[in-house]
A protein has these predicted regions:
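Gly/Gly-Pro- and Ser/Thr-rich, intrinsically disordered tail segments characteristic of DNA damage-repair
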Residues: 1-220, 226, 269, 350-397
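Short, hydrophobic beta-strand segments
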Residues: 101-107, 294-297, 340-345
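A glycine-rich phosphate-binding loop feature that marks nucleotide/adenosyl-phosphate handling sites
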Residues: 140-144, 225-226, 277-288, 326-337, ...
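C-terminal hydrophobic structural anchor segments
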Residues: 308-366
Length: 397
């Protein structure tokens, strides 16, 4: 089963504020002509306003489009409420993003109710526990891929199933790029092999698909389209990172440091919450001119303290060759290992550092982000706003 919250951020705003209901609204990164639209309400979508558009494009399509800036705390709260509802039916679920969940009910008591009955009850629970304006589209199928495909057949508030008796009819009504994972380049690659429709895709031999994709990925597509589950693998976390698109064209190192500090603190909080430490640190910069630069460093020992990560990131950023206005600044860490493999040093200094970092994290988790932190964070208060990535939900608790 796949559950998709319709028009996520926009619908949550309409649920919270009755005056927004029935109106075309959009949540954008910035309320400026160049701001990117993150979510548009169902009313706005009907007028052609889509995710990824610029605010000025949306207003050309809908002159009375109301633009709101994101409220991440509100969206995280709703996401956690969704988790609580789903957990009542099955512990076997995976948040695919802030607004999507994949569920496996096999072997759970709720499975005896039937998938459609469970879907209807989840919809009802959402109305009662979260809000009557919130709608979800639910897809049911033999595997995750087809369940997601089913969830978008009749948006909003849909409930559809793809099974052995209707899949050909549904495939016939879809375009290749309607399938999650098939973008323009993949569609062009398939066309070179004489595959133009989803039914062509389904009828193709496994060997032909392997040739078309130049990899084993073609065989995986062969299995997906036939209902085999191959996407249930929970790949190990390889890195953590945070990035920020600057609203102002900073280029001096001293102007970028408060932003780098805050990004590093946010990254470390997620790293610690997930129970990891890291050996590698990296910085990436995309400039307004289109230039891109990145640099990494791998250390012999693992790093845990935010201050150590920041020191390393600061040194790397100082090596950037371009003196141009920055568009996006990113800090990331890699070479992860679980903190339960901790080996104490002779004098116990590292153990104290770990405990201090964990204590700061616990205080911030309870009382709010950056209640405790480096003084330089204060300089970035009005520069780095709280943001939430659609896929950044692993660490939410």
């Amino acid at each position: 089963m796949h559950i998709d919250l319709n028009s996520c951020f926009a619908t949550i705003e309409q649920q919270a504020n009755r005056q927004l209901r029935g109106r075309p609204i959009a949540v954008a990164a910035y309320n400026s002509p160049g701001g990117c639209i993150l979510a548009s309400s169902i009313e706005a979508k009907r007028l052609g306003v889509k995710t990824g558009m610029r605010v000025q494009e949306g207003k050309l399509l809908c002159s009375d489009l109301l633009i709101l800036e994101p409220d991440p705390a509100k969206y995280r709260c709703v996401h956690l409420q969704f988790r609580e509802i789903i957990n009542c039916y099955t512990p076997e679920f995976s948040p695919k993003s802030i607004d999507e969940f994949a569920l496996n009910l096999e072997g759970c008591p709720a499975f005896k109710l039937g998938m459609h009955e469970v879907a209807k009850r989840i919809k009802c629970d959402i109305k009662n526990a979260i809000g009557d304006y919130i709608t979800v589209s639910i897809g049911i199928a033999p595997n995750r891929f087809l369940a997601k495909a089913a969830s978008v057949l009749h948006k909003p508030d849909g409930l559809d199933e793809i099974h052995a008796y209707n899949f050909k009819e549904i495939y016939a009504g879809l375009k290749l790029q309607d399938l999650c994972g098939i973008a323009a380049n993949s569609a062009a690659r398939l066309a070179e092999s004489g595959i133009y429709t989803v039914m062509d895709f389904y009828n193709a031999k496994a060997s032909d698909l392997i040739r078309a994709f130049h990899s084993i990925g073609g065989y995986y597509w062969y299995l997906r389209l036939r209902g085999w589950e191959i996407d249930a693998v929970d790949f190990a976390r390889k890195s953590f990172g945070n990035s920020y698109a600057l609203p102002k064209p900073f280029w001096k190192l001293e102007d970028l440091l408060p932003i780098l500090q805050k990004l590093t603190e946010k990254m470390c909080f997620r790293l610690h919450t997930s129970g990891f430490k890291a050996r590698g640190v990296g910085v990436a910069v995309r400039y307004k001119t289109g230039n891109f630069w990145h640099k990494t460093r791998l250390y012999a020992d693992f790093i845990y303290k935010p201050g150590d990560f920041f020191t390393s990131a600061f040194k790397l950023l100082g090596l950037a060759p371009y003196k141009e206005p920055v568009h996006t600044l990113t800090v990331f860490c890699f070479g992860l290992i679980k903190t339960d493999t901790f080996q104490p040093d002779l004098f116990g200094v590292e153990e104290k550092n770990y405990k201090l970092a964990d204590a700061v994290d616990a205080i911030n988790a309870k009382w709010g982000n950056f209640v405790l932190g480096p003084a330089s964070i204060l300089l970035s208060k009005d520069l780095v706003k709280d943001r939430i990535a659609f896929g950044g939900v692993r660490e939410l608790t």
